[in-house]
Design a protein with these regions (language model features):
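Alpha-helix C-terminal capping segments
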Residues: 119-123, 144, 209
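Extended intrinsically disordered or low-complexity regions, especially N/C-terminal cytosolic tails and loops
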Residues: 1-100, 148-152, 159, 175-239
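Short, charged amphipathic alpha-helical segments flanked by flexible coils
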Residues: 125-143, 173-190
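Short, contiguous, well-structured surface segments enriched in hydrophobic/aromatic residues
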Residues: 76-80, 102-135
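Alpha-helical structural motif
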Residues: 5, 129, 133-136, 156, ...
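Charged/polar positions within long, soluble alpha-helices
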Residues: 116-124, 162-173, 215
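Short, mixed-charge amphipathic alpha-helical segments
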Residues: 136-178
Length: 239
């Protein structure tokens, strides 16, 4: 995912310890939602929260481990004849964090996408077996009367995920600007996507509001008794 940020990922202006605390709070919130859910075992509306908690913990632990990349006692000297120079280690820390942020974003999206598809299929909203997750979400938004802000949130979420798939922003429109919570996200063909803040701040921001959205959809689907998580059908055997 190529984006423009106000600060570099390892900028001293970003309080990373604060971001770790925020991620931990979101992971705990998701775990609490899972524990307190009234939905049955293996219902995707229950399981989605444990999946999101897992991805949030993965990101949080990755950030904590990244501190070792600029430590003279890090793993590099243990596996190399000589340690890398400090300047190189700082660059590697930035590369590591960029990869971590992108990896989290992609995996987080996969969990949410699977959740939305199962919701749509269970309620016959996806009668035409639509493949596009954006079109599926629009149908869900219409069915459950989701707000324009909800639609904008998922549009931003989806467009940034597509950058990884498509290698850039592609649309019939030359430019696309989406507003959410007072922030503007600018997508332009041939240019880096402009975020209103750094990748780690964006990850925390998007995760918080996606959790809000899923809580809302879960409430609106309470009349559906059971929506089976497709992971519950997977079996592994050893030969």
């Amino acid at each position: 995912m190529k984006v423009e940020e106000k600060e570099k990922v390892h900028s001293p202006l970003i309080d990373m310890k604060k971001k770790v605390r925020e991620l931990n709070a979101l992971a705990k919130r998701s775990k609490k939602n899972f524990d307190n859910s009234n939905y049955r075992k293996n219902d995707i509306r229950k399981n989605i929260f444990i999946y999101m908690a897992s991805e949030l913990q993965f990101l949080m632990l990755g950030i904590m481990l990244s501190e070792e990349l600029t430590s003279y006692e890090c793993f590099w000297p243990k596996w190399k004849n000589s340690p890398l120079q400090e300047e190189a280690m700082i660059k590697h820390q930035g590369d590591f964090l960029n990869s971590l942020y992108n990896g989290f974003y992609f995996l987080f999206f996969v969990q949410v996408e699977n959740y939305l598809r199962l919701i749509a299929n269970s309620n016959h909203i996806n009668k035409e077996e639509e493949k596009s997750i954006m079109k599926i979400f629009r149908n869900l938004a219409k069915e459950y009367n989701l707000s324009k802000e909800d639609k904008n949130l998922f549009s931003i979420f989806s467009e940034l995920r597509n950058l990884s798939h498509n290698g850039g922003f592609y649309s019939k429109e030359n430019n696309k600007s989406i507003e959410f919570k007072g922030y503007k996200f600018i997508f332009e063909k041939g240019n880096s996507t402009k975020l209103p803040f750094s990748l780690i701040e964006y990850n925390v921001f998007i995760a918080e509001h996606i959790i809000d959205l899923i809580e809302k959809i879960n409430q609106k689907t309470e009349k559906i008794d059971y929506i089976e998580d497709n992971y519950a059908k997977i079996e592994f055997t050893n030969e």
